[in-house]
Structure formats: structure tokens, C-alpha cells
């Protein structure tokens, strides 16, 4: 019984271990890095840290994702698995400066 409980407790960690983690920072109303290369066909965990004193919205029509990130905080967005290609994203509150692309190869 103990072993079964241990296996059940570890199962979520084993599932998450298959996700690839990428970090994206919002600083001065820009995404850093502005380009991220990821493997096609894999689920991606994107951790977005907003270092600005104002909120920003991660928005991508290509990825069908929107997420408001409050100032000085982090958010997680799961994407994929992606087909090979380019997937653009913007910071909807600062579209002129906050933009980038995820390239799946």
C-alpha cells in the first residue's frame, strides 16, 4: 500500500518531466529573448516573468493563447505540441515594442 501511495504521489512529477521548459522575460515592455527555438512535436511549458511595473498580456493568435501577467510576477503558459513553423506573439498592452516569435523545428 505504501508503494502504491508513493507511485501515485510521484505520478504528476513524472508527467511534467516530459514538458520542455522555456523562460521569457518582459522588461522595458519587450520580450527577452524575442525569438525562441523549440522542437516540433513536443509540449512546451513557457514561464513568463514580467519585470515591468505594469501588467502585460501575452497574446498569440497563432498559438491560441492569451494570458495577463501582473507587474512583478510570473505566469505559466502551456503550448504545443507544435507543427514545424513560426508562431508570433505580442504583448497586447505594448504591441509596438513587445513582440516575438516561437520557431518550432
Model segments located where?
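Beta-strand cores of secreted/periplasmic/IMS beta-sandwich domains, seen most often
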Residues: 35-52, 74-82, 88-90
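Glycine-rich phosphate-binding "P-loop"
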Residues: 16-17, 56
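Short alpha-helix capping/helix-loop boundary micro-motifs
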Residues: 29-31, 61
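Histidine- and aromatic-enriched segments that form or immediately flank copper-ligand environments
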Residues: 51-71, 100
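Extracellular/periplasmic metallocenter environments
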Residues: 18-23, 30, 70-105
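Short, surface-exposed secondary-structure edge patches
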Residues: 33-35, 66
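N-terminal signal peptide c-region/cleavage motif recognized by signal peptidases
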Residues: 12-13
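Positively charged n-region of N-terminal signal peptides that target proteins for export
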Residues: 1-4
Amino acid at each position: 500500500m505504501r508503494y502504491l501511495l508513493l507511485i501515485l504521489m510521484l505520478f504528476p512529477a513524472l508527467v511534467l518531466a516530459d514538458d520542455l521548459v522555456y523562460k521569457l522575460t518582459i522588461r522595458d515592455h519587450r520580450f527577452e529573448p524575442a525569438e525562441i527555438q523549440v522542437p516540433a512535436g513536443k509540449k512546451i511549458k513557457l514561464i513568463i516573468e514580467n519585470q515591468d511595473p505594469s501588467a502585460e498580456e501575452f497574446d498569440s493568435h497563432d498559438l491560441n493563447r492569451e494570458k495577463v501577467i501582473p507587474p512583478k510576477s510570473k505566469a505559466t503558459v502551456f503550448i504545443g505540441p507544435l507543427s514545424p513553423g513560426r508562431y508570433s506573439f505580442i504583448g497586447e498592452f505594448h504591441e509596438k515594442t513587445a513582440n516575438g516569435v516561437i520557431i518550432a523545428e
